[in-house]
Design a protein with these regions (language model features):
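Generic ordered-secondary-structure signal
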Residues: 10, 15, 63, 114-116
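Post-signal peptide N-terminal segment of mature Sec-exported envelope proteins
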Residues: 1-21
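Surface-exposed acidic loop/strand-edge motifs in secreted or periplasmic proteins
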Residues: 16-99
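Gly/Pro-enriched, hydrophobic low-complexity segments
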Residues: 77-161
Length: 161
């Protein structure tokens, strides 16, 4: 069984919906100027939707990822890497956790790639927690459609208390 990102995100969504914090968002498109805005109310189920794409804890993907674990002090870094020949968008997920009972994820990063003759897309999603609560998140990506320019983008959010 891999890291249960769905359960993690469901718990974060529930906690954030109850707490209802504002978010500071930063967006950059095509290497242009960074736009920053404060959003007072957020629909957390929609806001975190892209992170659900990193869910590899499905019966069809059992055995599809190699797991590498490195413990250092009170932290554990576990990386799930897609095995060669496996057709799934999630290339890699890394979860940094504090070893406790239960373990608490501090950082989650995932790389999602889609590549076919007409379209290439790669997204790197990242989130951090403080005391088990989401503190910030980020999505960086690139898209390339045949005959069109490459689009690079990044979006980040910081949860305000």
């Amino acid at each position: 069984m891999y890291f249960d990102i769905k359960a993690f995100l469901d718990a974060q969504t529930q906690e954030l919906t109850q707490r209802n914090p504002a978010v500071e968002k930063r967006v950059e498109l095509r290497g242009g100027q960074i736009e920053t805005t404060r959003v007072p109310e957020v629909d957390w189920s929609k806001e975190l939707q892209i992170f659900y794409q990193a869910d590899i804890n499905k019966p069809a993907l059992r055995g599809a990822y190699a797991v590498d674990s490195v413990a250092k002090g009170d932290t554990l870094r576990r990386t799930y890497s897609r095995k060669t020949g496996i057709d799934n968008a999630v290339e890699r997920i890394t979860v940094l956790s504090v070893v406790a009972t239960p373990a608490v994820a501090q950082e989650i990063t995932a790389t999602l790639t889609q590549d076919n003759p007409l379209f290439f897309s790669q997204k790197r999603v990242m989130m951090h927690t403080t005391d088990g609560r989401l503190s910030d998140y980020q999505v960086k990506g690139v898209q390339k459609l045949v005959l069109f320019d490459t689009l690079r983008y990044s979006a980040a959010g910081r949860v305000l208390n």
